[in-house]
Amino acid sequence: LFVREADEAWDLGPAMVEGGDGRRKVAYVDLGRLEEALRATRAEAAWPGWGFVAELPEFAELCERLGVTFIGPSPAAMRALGDKIASKRLAESLGLPVVPWAGAPAASEAEAARQAAELGFPVMVKATGGIGGRGVRDAETAGTLPSALKGARAEAWKWFGLATVFLERRLDGARHVDVQVLSDAWGGVWALPAREASIQRRHQKLVEESPVPGL
């Protein structure tokens, strides 16, 4: 739909290819092809939407190098918040509440088992660098923890080239509510309406509703 409705559409290559190292490579995070498109179109600004390339600090840096305005966070902000372990520690240092977690990566299966026992099942296994619901698995019991670790690590490596994971307590019955903040280069800041995104499949949002029912 977006390609059909666009004034111009640029082919970035095959949508998805398997690399020799087992990683999955997708065209929209190919910085070389994206640079070609930015140069060819003489783009003045780039807004890549949400998720994936929109959360790559390297793409924001590419835009800076080309003199293209990147509509999104700075590379420094992305690096501070793009790593889930680093962002949790940052939130804790500011006195903000976070979902109970192990406090450190799950470096081994034995370490993960110890952490999960302290947190209490069920737990979530999450890739520290994962986005878009990738690299996330549930572990209901100690018996399902090894497969959850293996699955989360494998998926995170395939998509992001990172296999570091950590454990977090699973909160059943919780709701997923987003609040986005929009700011400009002149100090203007706006908090956008909250959005309900609890309807998900495989940890990926299916429906977003605003305003949030019940709030």
Question: Predicted segment positions?
Answer:
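N-terminal beta-alpha lobe that positions the nucleotide/phosphoryl donor
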Residues: 1-215
